[in-house]
Amino acid sequence: EYETDNHSGMNVEEIAGLIFDYTSGYPFLVSRLCKLMDEEVAGSVSFPDKAAAWTKEGFLEAEKLLLSEKNTLFESLMGKLNDYPSLKRKLYSILFGGKKLVYNPDDPAVDIAVMFGFVKNDGGTLRIANRIFETRLYNYFLTTDEAQNSELFIFAPDDKLKFVQNGHLNMELV
């Protein structure tokens, strides 16, 4: 419908696929990404018109803008993490421990997270609902005081020097 009205020349199937891949159809995220592409990305230096904005690159720019903004959805997500420490621990273990947690609808924290669409039941396994939430949660957890003071963060810059030489990854060492 948008393409019919605006004639941006976008590949509708590709853009729709990207939007769904990143949002799993979460209405606020779909709407916000489209609005950002249309109003913020289009007309910028890198994307001078709607045709340039409604591309994969334009979509990725909109995603970057979305992930860096404060909005009611992300504030709600962070609020639920603070209100439900057990949910916070579960999401952390999924993201950083690779744990597969059993979906339990009787767990109040899980129940509230499902109700808000932050997580989902994927064949009996608790999963983060979409890539946008996953990335936002990664960003959040990586900037907590605990993460910043962990051995990984303290020693990572020194370890990087071992593996990256002259700006290139040394595959033999990896």
Label every PLM stretch briefly.
Residues V114, R131-I132:
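Secondary-structure transition/turn motif
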Residues T125-N130:
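Minor-groove-contacting beta-hairpin "wing" of winged helix-turn-helix DNA-binding domains
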Residues T4, F118, Y138, L142:
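Residue-level marker of positions within ordered structural domains that often coincide
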Residues N71, F133-N170:
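Short, amphipathic alpha-helical interaction segments positioned at domain boundaries
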Residues E1-F116, D122:
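Winged-helix-like regulatory helical subdomains adjacent to P-loop NTPase cores
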